[in-house]
Amino acid sequence: MDCIQCKRTFLNEDIVASISGSIMGDEHTDSYYYCSTCNVYTVVSWWDNFTGVETMEISGPISKEKGDKRIEIIRQCSQPWDKKCRCDAQRRYFNDTLD
């Protein structure tokens, strides 16, 4: 994975946070990569729909300030990898669109 702005290849330690949720039967996962060179985030979003087809989208750059706020929400969830989690942080992150 590369920084969307400077194209630097990310290392494993550049993955700052990930969260998964189930929306209309599809699993949606966002992973945040931080580029210390650019001071921005690149977000990689995966959709695994109920038929088993997976798609990926890369978005950004996201400012450090905005990305930090999103990551703060993710870190309030004790199980961000669990697409079935319905804690306040999960609901807030996914704008109350979870199954």
Model-derived features with residue positions:
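Secretory pathway export signals and precursors
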Residues: D2, S31-Y34, I73, W81-K83
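Intrinsically disordered, low-complexity segments enriched in small/polar residues
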Residues: D30-Y32, N39, R91
